[in-house]
Curated annotation (Swiss-Prot):
Name of protein: NAD(P)H-quinone oxidoreductase subunit 1
Gene Ontology CC: one annotated term: plasma membrane-derived thylakoid membrane
Membrane disposition: Multi-pass membrane protein
Source organism of this protein record: Synechococcus sp. (strain CC9311)
UniProt entry keywords in alphabetical sequence: Membrane, NAD, NADP, Plastoquinone, Quinone, Thylakoid, Translocase, Transmembrane, Transmembrane helix
PANTHER family: NADH DEHYDROGENASE SUBUNIT 1, NADH-UBIQUINONE OXIDOREDUCTASE CHAIN 1
Name of encoding gene: ndhA
Upper lineage: Bacteria, Bacillati, Cyanobacteriota, Cyanophyceae, Synechococcales
Transmembrane annotation, as ranges: 27-47, 97-117, 128-148, 166-186, 204-224, 266-286, 308-328, 347-367
Record text on subunit structure and interactions: NDH-1 is composed of at least 11 different subunits.
Catalytic activity: a plastoquinone + NADH + (n+1) H(+)(in) = a plastoquinol + NAD(+) + n H(+)(out); a plastoquinone + NADPH + (n+1) H(+)(in) = a plastoquinol + NADP(+) + n H(+)(out)
Protein backbone atom coordinates (compact mmCIF):
# COMPACT_ATOMS: atom_id res chain seq x y z
CA UNK A 1 0.00 0.00 0.00
CA UNK A 2 1.31 3.45 -0.91
CA UNK A 3 2.08 5.58 2.11
CA UNK A 4 0.59 8.58 0.29
CA UNK A 5 1.32 12.21 0.92
CA UNK A 6 2.16 13.39 4.42
CA UNK A 7 1.11 17.02 4.85
CA UNK A 8 3.02 17.71 8.06
CA UNK A 9 6.23 16.10 6.81
CA UNK A 10 6.06 17.91 3.44
CA UNK A 11 5.35 21.24 5.17
CA UNK A 12 8.24 20.81 7.61
CA UNK A 13 10.68 19.72 4.90
CA UNK A 14 9.78 22.75 2.77
CA UNK A 15 10.42 25.16 5.67
CA UNK A 16 13.63 23.41 6.67
CA UNK A 17 14.76 23.76 3.06
CA UNK A 18 14.37 27.53 3.49
CA UNK A 19 16.78 27.46 6.44
CA UNK A 20 14.37 27.17 9.40
CA UNK A 21 15.07 24.77 12.24
CA UNK A 22 12.92 21.66 12.74
CA UNK A 23 11.45 23.14 15.94
CA UNK A 24 10.49 26.40 14.20
CA UNK A 25 8.90 24.46 11.34
CA UNK A 26 6.89 22.42 13.85
CA UNK A 27 5.69 25.59 15.61
CA UNK A 28 4.57 27.12 12.31
CA UNK A 29 2.65 23.94 11.50
CA UNK A 30 0.51 24.09 14.68
CA UNK A 31 -2.07 26.72 13.52
CA UNK A 32 -2.05 25.40 9.95
CA UNK A 33 -4.41 22.40 10.46
CA UNK A 34 -7.25 24.50 11.90
CA UNK A 35 -6.81 27.09 9.15
CA UNK A 36 -6.95 24.30 6.58
CA UNK A 37 -10.12 22.87 8.17
CA UNK A 38 -11.83 26.28 8.20
CA UNK A 39 -10.97 26.95 4.55
CA UNK A 40 -12.09 23.46 3.46
CA UNK A 41 -15.34 23.70 5.44
CA UNK A 42 -16.23 27.17 4.17
CA UNK A 43 -15.43 26.30 0.55
CA UNK A 44 -17.48 23.11 0.90
CA UNK A 45 -20.42 25.14 2.24
CA UNK A 46 -20.21 27.72 -0.58
CA UNK A 47 -20.24 24.96 -3.21
CA UNK A 48 -23.12 23.16 -1.47
CA UNK A 49 -25.24 26.31 -1.16
CA UNK A 50 -24.71 27.10 -4.84
CA UNK A 51 -25.61 23.52 -5.80
CA UNK A 52 -28.72 23.63 -3.63
CA UNK A 53 -29.96 26.85 -5.21
CA UNK A 54 -29.33 25.67 -8.77
CA UNK A 55 -30.75 22.17 -8.20
CA UNK A 56 -33.84 23.52 -6.41
CA UNK A 57 -34.35 25.93 -9.30
CA UNK A 58 -34.10 23.06 -11.79
CA UNK A 59 -36.60 20.98 -9.80
CA UNK A 60 -39.05 23.92 -9.83
CA UNK A 61 -38.31 24.77 -13.49
CA UNK A 62 -36.58 28.06 -12.64
CA UNK A 63 -33.18 29.45 -13.58
CA UNK A 64 -31.86 30.18 -10.10
CA UNK A 65 -29.00 32.61 -9.38
CA UNK A 66 -27.19 33.66 -12.56
CA UNK A 67 -26.06 37.29 -12.24
CA UNK A 68 -23.51 37.11 -9.38
CA UNK A 69 -20.62 35.59 -11.29
CA UNK A 70 -20.73 32.94 -14.00
CA UNK A 71 -23.84 30.77 -13.45
CA UNK A 72 -24.35 32.57 -10.13
CA UNK A 73 -21.36 30.94 -8.40
CA UNK A 74 -20.72 34.09 -6.34
CA UNK A 75 -24.29 34.25 -4.99
CA UNK A 76 -23.49 32.26 -1.78
CA UNK A 77 -20.56 34.61 -1.12
CA UNK A 78 -22.84 37.62 -1.62
CA UNK A 79 -25.38 36.14 0.81
CA UNK A 80 -22.64 35.56 3.38
CA UNK A 81 -21.35 39.13 3.09
CA UNK A 82 -24.91 40.42 3.46
CA UNK A 83 -25.34 38.51 6.73
CA UNK A 84 -21.97 39.81 7.99
CA UNK A 85 -23.04 43.46 7.69
CA UNK A 86 -26.60 43.02 9.00
CA UNK A 87 -27.43 44.34 12.46
CA UNK A 88 -27.02 41.84 15.29
CA UNK A 89 -30.09 42.21 17.53
CA UNK A 90 -30.56 40.62 20.95
CA UNK A 91 -34.20 40.65 22.20
CA UNK A 92 -34.87 42.71 25.34
CA UNK A 93 -35.79 39.85 27.66
CA UNK A 94 -33.42 37.27 26.19
CA UNK A 95 -30.51 35.84 28.17
CA UNK A 96 -27.70 37.57 26.26
CA UNK A 97 -24.95 35.16 27.36
CA UNK A 98 -26.80 31.97 26.47
CA UNK A 99 -28.25 33.64 23.38
CA UNK A 100 -24.72 34.32 22.11
CA UNK A 101 -23.23 31.01 23.27
CA UNK A 102 -25.91 28.87 21.57
CA UNK A 103 -24.77 29.35 17.94
CA UNK A 104 -21.14 28.85 18.99
CA UNK A 105 -21.95 25.49 20.61
CA UNK A 106 -23.73 24.46 17.42
CA UNK A 107 -21.01 25.29 14.90
CA UNK A 108 -17.73 24.66 16.78
CA UNK A 109 -18.19 20.88 17.36
CA UNK A 110 -19.09 20.42 13.69
CA UNK A 111 -15.93 22.22 12.54
CA UNK A 112 -13.78 20.25 15.00
CA UNK A 113 -15.24 17.01 13.61
CA UNK A 114 -13.53 17.76 10.29
CA UNK A 115 -10.19 17.09 11.97
CA UNK A 116 -10.72 13.32 11.68
CA UNK A 117 -11.86 13.29 8.02
CA UNK A 118 -9.14 11.64 5.84
CA UNK A 119 -8.70 12.42 2.15
CA UNK A 120 -5.73 10.05 1.80
CA UNK A 121 -3.46 7.72 3.77
CA UNK A 122 -1.77 10.69 5.46
CA UNK A 123 -4.02 13.46 4.14
CA UNK A 124 -5.88 14.26 7.34
CA UNK A 125 -5.35 16.75 10.11
CA UNK A 126 -5.43 14.45 13.14
CA UNK A 127 -5.09 10.67 12.88
CA UNK A 128 -6.32 9.86 16.37
CA UNK A 129 -6.92 6.20 17.04
CA UNK A 130 -10.47 6.89 18.27
CA UNK A 131 -11.59 9.24 15.50
CA UNK A 132 -15.09 7.78 15.22
CA UNK A 133 -15.62 7.99 18.99
CA UNK A 134 -14.39 11.61 18.92
CA UNK A 135 -16.86 12.49 16.17
CA UNK A 136 -19.82 10.90 18.00
CA UNK A 137 -18.80 12.71 21.21
CA UNK A 138 -18.57 16.08 19.46
CA UNK A 139 -21.89 15.61 17.66
CA UNK A 140 -23.62 15.00 21.00
CA UNK A 141 -22.76 18.58 22.07
CA UNK A 142 -24.87 20.15 19.31
CA UNK A 143 -28.32 19.49 20.90
CA UNK A 144 -27.19 21.46 23.96
CA UNK A 145 -26.53 24.51 21.78
CA UNK A 146 -29.87 24.15 19.99
CA UNK A 147 -31.82 23.86 23.24
CA UNK A 148 -29.83 26.73 24.74
CA UNK A 149 -30.65 28.97 21.76
CA UNK A 150 -34.35 28.20 21.95
CA UNK A 151 -34.54 28.73 25.71
CA UNK A 152 -32.46 31.93 25.78
CA UNK A 153 -34.56 33.66 23.09
CA UNK A 154 -37.57 34.10 25.42
CA UNK A 155 -39.88 33.20 22.54
CA UNK A 156 -42.38 30.34 22.55
CA UNK A 157 -41.67 29.42 18.92
CA UNK A 158 -37.93 29.38 19.60
CA UNK A 159 -38.39 27.24 22.71
CA UNK A 160 -40.57 24.71 20.88
CA UNK A 161 -38.05 24.61 18.03
CA UNK A 162 -35.19 24.04 20.46
CA UNK A 163 -37.07 21.24 22.23
CA UNK A 164 -37.88 19.61 18.92
CA UNK A 165 -34.27 19.90 17.76
CA UNK A 166 -32.93 18.33 20.95
CA UNK A 167 -35.49 15.50 20.88
CA UNK A 168 -34.80 14.81 17.21
CA UNK A 169 -31.03 14.84 17.63
CA UNK A 170 -31.10 12.50 20.64
CA UNK A 171 -33.58 10.14 18.93
CA UNK A 172 -31.42 9.66 15.85
CA UNK A 173 -28.00 9.80 17.51
CA UNK A 174 -28.43 6.32 19.01
CA UNK A 175 -29.28 4.34 15.84
CA UNK A 176 -26.59 6.30 13.98
CA UNK A 177 -23.98 5.28 16.57
CA UNK A 178 -25.11 1.63 16.40
CA UNK A 179 -24.82 1.67 12.59
CA UNK A 180 -21.27 3.01 12.89
CA UNK A 181 -20.46 0.43 15.56
CA UNK A 182 -21.18 -2.36 13.06
CA UNK A 183 -18.58 -0.87 10.69
CA UNK A 184 -16.11 -0.47 13.56
CA UNK A 185 -16.66 -4.12 14.47
CA UNK A 186 -15.74 -5.24 10.95
CA UNK A 187 -12.63 -3.04 10.72
CA UNK A 188 -11.49 -3.72 14.32
CA UNK A 189 -10.62 -0.05 14.71
CA UNK A 190 -12.11 3.34 15.60
CA UNK A 191 -9.66 5.10 13.25
CA UNK A 192 -11.14 6.51 10.04
CA UNK A 193 -7.90 5.69 8.21
CA UNK A 194 -8.06 2.03 9.27
CA UNK A 195 -11.71 1.82 8.20
CA UNK A 196 -10.83 3.01 4.69
CA UNK A 197 -7.80 0.71 4.49
CA UNK A 198 -10.05 -2.22 5.39
CA UNK A 199 -12.06 -1.48 2.20
CA UNK A 200 -9.13 -1.53 -0.24
CA UNK A 201 -8.71 -5.26 -0.84
CA UNK A 202 -10.86 -5.81 -3.95
CA UNK A 203 -11.65 -2.32 -5.20
CA UNK A 204 -15.35 -1.45 -5.39
CA UNK A 205 -16.38 -4.93 -4.26
CA UNK A 206 -14.66 -4.46 -0.89
CA UNK A 207 -16.69 -1.36 0.03
CA UNK A 208 -18.66 -1.68 3.25
CA UNK A 209 -21.93 -0.76 1.54
CA UNK A 210 -22.16 -4.33 0.14
CA UNK A 211 -21.66 -5.89 3.58
CA UNK A 212 -23.63 -3.24 5.45
CA UNK A 213 -26.54 -2.16 3.19
CA UNK A 214 -28.92 -1.85 6.14
CA UNK A 215 -26.34 0.05 8.19
CA UNK A 216 -25.74 2.38 5.25
CA UNK A 217 -29.45 3.25 4.99
CA UNK A 218 -29.75 3.72 8.76
CA UNK A 219 -26.69 5.99 8.83
CA UNK A 220 -27.88 8.10 5.88
CA UNK A 221 -31.41 8.56 7.25
CA UNK A 222 -30.07 9.46 10.70
CA UNK A 223 -27.52 11.84 9.18
CA UNK A 224 -30.28 13.70 7.31
CA UNK A 225 -32.27 13.93 10.54
CA UNK A 226 -29.21 15.21 12.43
CA UNK A 227 -28.71 17.88 9.75
CA UNK A 228 -32.44 18.80 9.98
CA UNK A 229 -32.93 18.33 6.27
CA UNK A 230 -36.34 17.70 4.73
CA UNK A 231 -38.29 15.57 5.42
CA UNK A 232 -36.85 15.98 8.94
CA UNK A 233 -36.75 19.79 9.30
CA UNK A 234 -39.39 19.98 12.05
CA UNK A 235 -37.30 22.16 14.43
CA UNK A 236 -37.60 25.06 11.96
CA UNK A 237 -40.88 24.26 10.20
CA UNK A 238 -42.03 27.65 8.85
CA UNK A 239 -45.76 26.82 8.86
CA UNK A 240 -45.69 25.82 12.55
CA UNK A 241 -42.78 27.57 14.29
CA UNK A 242 -41.88 30.60 12.11
CA UNK A 243 -38.15 29.67 12.05
CA UNK A 244 -37.90 27.54 15.20
CA UNK A 245 -34.92 28.21 17.46
CA UNK A 246 -33.57 30.66 14.83
CA UNK A 247 -36.61 32.98 15.03
CA UNK A 248 -34.98 35.75 17.09
CA UNK A 249 -31.54 35.52 15.48
CA UNK A 250 -30.12 37.89 12.87
CA UNK A 251 -26.79 38.91 11.41
CA UNK A 252 -23.72 36.82 12.16
CA UNK A 253 -25.42 34.66 14.80
CA UNK A 254 -28.01 33.55 12.24
CA UNK A 255 -25.18 33.00 9.75
CA UNK A 256 -23.51 30.62 12.22
CA UNK A 257 -26.63 28.41 12.29
CA UNK A 258 -26.77 28.52 8.50
CA UNK A 259 -23.07 27.71 8.22
CA UNK A 260 -23.25 24.92 10.80
CA UNK A 261 -26.14 23.22 9.02
CA UNK A 262 -24.33 23.03 5.69
CA UNK A 263 -20.96 22.12 7.24
CA UNK A 264 -22.74 19.25 9.00
CA UNK A 265 -24.33 18.12 5.73
CA UNK A 266 -20.97 18.03 3.89
CA UNK A 267 -19.33 16.33 6.91
CA UNK A 268 -22.05 13.66 6.98
CA UNK A 269 -21.61 13.01 3.26
CA UNK A 270 -17.83 12.71 3.69
CA UNK A 271 -18.28 10.26 6.57
CA UNK A 272 -20.65 8.11 4.50
CA UNK A 273 -18.01 8.13 1.76
CA UNK A 274 -15.35 7.03 4.26
CA UNK A 275 -17.37 4.47 6.21
CA UNK A 276 -19.27 2.80 3.36
CA UNK A 277 -17.92 3.89 -0.04
CA UNK A 278 -14.21 3.22 0.26
CA UNK A 279 -13.07 6.79 0.93
CA UNK A 280 -10.02 7.69 -1.13
CA UNK A 281 -9.66 4.14 -2.48
CA UNK A 282 -7.76 4.17 -5.77
CA UNK A 283 -9.81 2.71 -8.68
CA UNK A 284 -6.89 0.45 -9.71
CA UNK A 285 -4.16 -1.17 -7.58
CA UNK A 286 -1.38 1.34 -6.85
CA UNK A 287 1.19 -1.31 -7.80
CA UNK A 288 -0.15 -1.28 -11.38
CA UNK A 289 0.23 2.50 -11.58
CA UNK A 290 3.80 2.39 -10.21
CA UNK A 291 4.71 -0.38 -12.66
CA UNK A 292 3.24 1.54 -15.61
CA UNK A 293 5.19 4.68 -14.61
CA UNK A 294 8.35 2.66 -13.99
CA UNK A 295 8.61 4.12 -10.48
CA UNK A 296 8.79 2.53 -7.02
CA UNK A 297 5.54 2.58 -5.08
CA UNK A 298 6.86 5.23 -2.66
CA UNK A 299 8.17 7.55 -5.42
CA UNK A 300 7.05 11.22 -5.10
CA UNK A 301 5.28 11.10 -8.50
CA UNK A 302 3.25 8.02 -7.52
CA UNK A 303 2.39 9.60 -4.16
CA UNK A 304 1.29 12.82 -5.87
CA UNK A 305 -0.97 11.02 -8.36
CA UNK A 306 -2.54 8.69 -5.77
CA UNK A 307 -3.01 11.56 -3.31
CA UNK A 308 -4.70 13.77 -5.92
CA UNK A 309 -6.96 10.98 -7.18
CA UNK A 310 -7.80 10.05 -3.58
CA UNK A 311 -8.97 13.58 -2.79
CA UNK A 312 -11.03 13.71 -6.01
CA UNK A 313 -12.62 10.29 -5.32
CA UNK A 314 -13.56 11.22 -1.73
CA UNK A 315 -15.05 14.58 -2.71
CA UNK A 316 -16.96 13.16 -5.71
CA UNK A 317 -18.56 10.44 -3.58
CA UNK A 318 -19.47 12.99 -0.91
CA UNK A 319 -21.04 15.43 -3.37
CA UNK A 320 -23.03 12.65 -5.00
CA UNK A 321 -24.63 12.14 -1.58
CA UNK A 322 -25.08 15.91 -1.16
CA UNK A 323 -26.89 15.94 -4.52
CA UNK A 324 -29.22 13.18 -3.28
CA UNK A 325 -29.88 15.11 -0.04
CA UNK A 326 -30.75 18.25 -2.02
CA UNK A 327 -33.12 16.31 -4.29
CA UNK A 328 -34.82 14.79 -1.24
CA UNK A 329 -35.33 18.25 0.25
CA UNK A 330 -37.23 19.49 -2.78
CA UNK A 331 -39.17 16.33 -3.62
CA UNK A 332 -40.40 14.91 -0.27
CA UNK A 333 -43.05 16.23 2.16
CA UNK A 334 -42.31 16.98 5.80
CA UNK A 335 -43.22 14.28 8.34
CA UNK A 336 -45.12 14.98 11.56
CA UNK A 337 -43.28 15.07 14.88
CA UNK A 338 -44.93 11.83 16.06
CA UNK A 339 -43.96 10.10 12.81
CA UNK A 340 -40.39 11.35 13.15
CA UNK A 341 -40.02 10.05 16.71
CA UNK A 342 -41.73 6.75 15.88
CA UNK A 343 -39.34 6.23 12.97
CA UNK A 344 -36.33 6.82 15.21
CA UNK A 345 -37.34 4.89 18.34
CA UNK A 346 -39.67 2.17 17.02
CA UNK A 347 -38.07 1.34 13.68
CA UNK A 348 -34.48 2.54 13.21
CA UNK A 349 -33.27 1.76 16.74
CA UNK A 350 -34.46 -1.91 16.75
CA UNK A 351 -33.25 -2.31 13.16
CA UNK A 352 -29.81 -0.94 14.09
CA UNK A 353 -29.60 -3.36 17.04
CA UNK A 354 -30.55 -6.31 14.83
CA UNK A 355 -28.01 -5.18 12.21
CA UNK A 356 -25.29 -5.04 14.89
CA UNK A 357 -26.12 -8.53 16.17
CA UNK A 358 -26.23 -9.98 12.64
CA UNK A 359 -22.86 -8.35 11.87
CA UNK A 360 -21.38 -9.92 15.01
CA UNK A 361 -22.73 -13.35 14.01
CA UNK A 362 -21.41 -13.02 10.45
CA UNK A 363 -18.03 -11.90 11.79
CA UNK A 364 -17.81 -15.12 13.79
CA UNK A 365 -19.09 -17.31 10.94
CA UNK A 366 -17.13 -15.68 8.09
CA UNK A 367 -14.09 -13.98 9.65
CA UNK A 368 -12.31 -13.35 6.33
CA UNK A 369 -15.24 -11.54 4.69
CA UNK A 370 -16.34 -9.64 7.82
CA UNK A 371 -13.01 -8.72 9.40
CA UNK A 372 -12.57 -11.48 11.93
Amino acid sequence: MSPGLDLEQSFSQALEGLGLSAQAARMLWLPFPMLLVLVAAVVGVLVTVWLERKISAAVQQRVGPEYAGALGVLQPLADGLKLLVKEDIIPDRADSILFTLGPVLVVVPVILSWLIVPFGQNLLISDVGVGIFLWISLSSVQPIGLLMSGYASNNKYSLLGGLRAAAQSISYEIPLALAVLAVVMMSNSLSTVDIVNQQTGAGVLSWNIWRQPVGFLIFWICALAECERLPFDLPEAEEELVAGYQTEYSGMKFALFYLGSYINLVLSALLVSILYLGGWGFPIPVEWLASWLGQPIDAPLVQLITGTVGIVMTVLKAYLLVFIAILLRWTTPRVRIDQLLDLGWKFLLPLALVNLLVTAALKLAFPVAFGG
